[in-house]
Structure formats: C-alpha cells, structure tokens
Swiss-Prot record:
Pfam families in the record: ClpS
PANTHER family registered for this protein in UniProt: ATP-DEPENDENT CLP PROTEASE ADAPTER PROTEIN CLPS, ATP-DEPENDENT CLP PROTEASE ADAPTER PROTEIN CLPS1, CHLOROPLASTIC
Function: Involved in the modulation of the specificity of the ClpAP-mediated ATP-dependent protein degradation.
Protein name per UniProt: ATP-dependent Clp protease adapter protein ClpS
InterPro entries registered for this protein in UniProt: ClpS, ClpS_core, Ribosomal_bL12_C/ClpS-like
HAMAP family in UniProt: ClpS (MF_00302)
Taxonomic superkingdom: Bacteria
Encoding gene per record: clpS
Subunit organization: Binds to the N-terminal domain of the chaperone ClpA.
Annotated GO biological process: protein catabolic process; proteolysis
Family designation: Belongs to the ClpS family.
Lineage of origin: Bacteria, Pseudomonadati, Pseudomonadota, Gammaproteobacteria, Enterobacterales
Length: 106
C-alpha cells in the first residue's frame, strides 16, 4: 500500500533542491545636462522639487551642471529613474526651458 502522505512532499517543486537567489535590481543614474538657456534658479527648483535636495545641495549640483556640463542627481531603479526623467523633462517643457534630463546605467 502506498503512503497516504505523498501529497505533502513538496521536493518536486524545487528544481534540484536549489533555491535561486534574488538578484538586486539594475540601477540607473539620473543626469541633468547643461544648456545655455535654462536659468540657474530653474535648475535649483528642479533639484529641490523632484529630488528633494535642500537649497545648499541643489545649488552645488546646479553649479556642477553649469561648469562640468552635467551632474548626477541620484541613482535609482529603472522604473523610478525613468519616471523622474519623464517628470523633469515634462516640467522643463511646460516652463519653456530646454533643460534635458537623461539616464544611464550605473
């Protein structure tokens, strides 16, 4: 007579008795790029509004954008980075500024 408890054996559900480890998500840098037309005050506003920087840090990053051509605003998962880029670019266009926010793999 067979075992009545065979249905309790879950080993067949685990491939080779190994549990796959979860990989950390891919991360992306959100970057503000310099242009010759967007006012510095607007860049500071963007950094405070979308990245929650205080005035000192926002000013420092704005100066990096101005003098170095770009600055990393933060590193995020793909979905968060894409959303931030879209929101910043939309906000810039709504305010008629050519400010460009991009992302690249970290």
């Amino acid at each position: 007579m067979g075992k009545n408890n065979d249905w309790l054996n879950f080993e067949h559900l685990v491939k080779d008795k190994q549990i796959e480890a979860l990989k950390p998500p891919s991360m992306y840098k959100v970057i503000l790029n310099n242009d010759d037309y967007t006012p510095m005050e607007f860049v500071i506003d963007v950094l405070q509004k979308f990245f929650s920087y205080d005035i000192e840090r926002a000013t420092q990053l704005m100066l990096n954008v101005h003098y170095q051509g770009k600055a990393i605003c933060g590193v995020f998962t793909a979905e968060v980075a894409e959303t931030k880029v879209a929101h910043v670019n939309q906000y810039a266009r709504e305010n008629e500024h050519p400010l460009l926010c991009t992302l690249e793999k970290a």
